[in-house]
Amino acid sequence: MFQDNPLLAQLKEKLHSQTPRVEGVVKGTEKGFGFLEVDAQKSYFIPPPFMKKVMHGDRVSAVIQSDKDREVADPETLIEPFLTRFVGRVQKKDDRLSIIPDHPLLKDAIQCRPERSVKHDFQAGDWAVAEMRRHPLKGDRTFYAELTEFITTAEDHLAPWWVTLSRHNLEREAPDVTTPQSMLDEQLEREDLTSLPFVTIDSASTEDMDDALYVEDAGNGALKLIVAIADPTAYVPVGSKLDAVAAERAFTNYLPGFNIPMLPRQLSDDICSLRPHERRPVLACRITLAADGTPADDVQFFAAWIESHAKLAYNDVSDWLETGGSSAWQPENEAIANQIRLLNRLCLARSEWRQAHALVFKDRPDFRFLLGEKGEVLDIIAEHRRIANRIVEESMILANICAATVLRDRLGFGIYNVHLGFDEANAEQAAAVLANHGVTADPLAIATLEGFRNLRRELDALPTQFLDSRIRRFQSFAEVSTTPGPHFGLGLEAYATWTSPIRKYGDMVNHRLLKAIIKGEQSARPADELSLKMAERRRQNRMAERDVGDWLYSRFLQKAAGSEQRFSAEVIDVSRGGMRVRLQENGAVAFIPAPFIHAVRDEMVCSNENGSVQIKGEVAYRVTDLIEVTIAEVRMETRSIVARPVA
């Protein structure tokens, strides 16, 4: 009788339209209940029974109901699931499989089965890639997934690497493509510079040497520098299968312990590598520098043959320069010694030029994991940037500035690294934060390159980096662009890299553009899709490096958990839940929960906006503070380190 009743249908529609609904993101907790976060200020409680229908991170539309004195959210429609493709660990019970996603807030096992194409016989503890197939808000009774790829077994010591690469959908191996053995006929004249004592300076273990340097005294304090860069585009044809593979990978992926090259190792580590006493084709740049480090306008790009006369290591060169030539290591002849002395002079002049006309990053050490046969962490070495590192850095930055200028002036395009500092709105916010701390900044001025440079110099002169950390969050991210633009972070009008073509596809593209200029040929602008792809790949590679690092740091610091061993740590972030710190001696990041900071929660304010922790109205900690901590706990399942401040 009520079937197809238009009045009833109307009433249902009216009730549905009048029921309050909100859209937000589900935030799970370890206690079964959750919250629907609508924005930074507003969230609704989700009771445990309703949480069974959703997963942490799902974007949903929910009905708001009143339950006693509070409003609760009942998820109704799935807008965007948190999980689509994911990695996790397989569980097996009575031959039935389930998978627990590898995520700190996803603890529930999801029923699953292998996809038909996957032939592996899954066992408990195996790592796998899975894809979600069913979701309760899509009309299904339960969550359900299919296993699409076996990663590795529970016992594999190299699981941190394989799991991370699978999570980010990155390659495990070097490209499996036929390696070209002979050079292309590029109709390119090459100068023979094999008699000049070029040198490479790298880590002792480096095999893919892609830059060599030669410098001579030009009189009156001036120097002439030739930067010679390995030439993979002399072997890799545009549009070839190998070119497509390199474009897809975009970068060599450097992870703790090993790298996954962009090009086949035979090319990157041998045929193109600027090995000592081997004749190699290069793309080169000739630059004249005044005594104060200013480059002349007669920059010349050209193709050449060179022969590296020495493979030098950063630490050897630094030791020799820092001890005035009395270190255990000595250059093999006077020609090499003279090159090192002249390169040191060039480095000091260029460093002063950049201090005055651009911006120089503050030195932070790199941390290198010393690994055993089974992937165990034997030690973590802090590698500080020394004079030899700075010689190479200054030479490469100079060469990249020259390429950026030539590409801009001759073509109007290339692969550029662009960083635009503050946009208008963020400049206003940054200026307001600075004003609160007694620093006057004009929002319009700091949105310009010159104004940004002046602000950075002013902040760098302050006794702490606190203010710098406060305004950094208002800055835009660096991006890859085919159009020339400024790089505020470096304080430069334009910056285009070409000095690492073995490791970066964008540098290969710039090589081809520079060669076209040398030959007087026309060039097509690189596709914008390429710059987007490169930016995404760079993000994935950095996340993979961070994830493997988190795993290895957790392994390494397990032995310190619960002990009295003290670590000096820098406060790097404050959130409602506590503080994040970075251990100074090894670079590990640890979390200090709020209850470890102060027992009485109501007496404490943890403010992300202010970058500080206040206790009873007084600032107790703030970002950039150095404090002492002990390791309270290491949670291997989430690769997280929990620290406690030393009272």
UniProtKB/Swiss-Prot annotation:
GO biological process terms, alphabetically, are: mRNA catabolic process
The UniProt keyword set, sorted, is: Cytoplasm, Exonuclease, Hydrolase, Nuclease, RNA-binding
Q: What GO molecular function terms would the record report?
A: exoribonuclease II activity; RNA binding
This protein's GO CC annotations:
cytosol
**UniProt cross-references to Pfam families, sorted A to Z:** OB_RNB, RNB, S1
Subcellular location, record wording: Cytoplasm
Q: Which residues form the S1 motif domain?
A: 564-646
EC no.?
Answer: 3.1.13.1
Reaction catalysis annotation: Exonucleolytic cleavage in the 3'- to 5'-direction to yield nucleoside 5'-phosphates
Question: Which InterPro entries does the annotation name?
Answer: CSD (IPR011129), NA-bd_OB-fold (IPR012340), RNase_B_OB_dom (IPR013223), RNase_II (IPR011804), RNase_II/R (IPR001900), RNase_II/R_CS (IPR022966), RNase_II/RNase_R (IPR004476), RNR_Ribonuclease (IPR050180)
What residues does the RNB domain cover? 190-519
Its predominant location is cytoplasm
SMART domains cross-referenced by the UniProt entry = CSP, RNB
Its biological purpose: Involved in mRNA degradation. Hydrolyzes single-stranded polyribonucleotides processively in the 3' to 5' direction.
HAMAP family, alphabetically?
RNase_II
Q: Its family?
A: Belongs to the RNR ribonuclease family. RNase II subfamily.
Q: What is the protein's name according to its record?
A: Exoribonuclease 2
* Species, as recorded: Erwinia tasmaniensis (strain DSM 17950 / CFBP 7177 / CIP 109463 / NCPPB 4357 / Et1/99)
Gene that encodes the chain: rnb
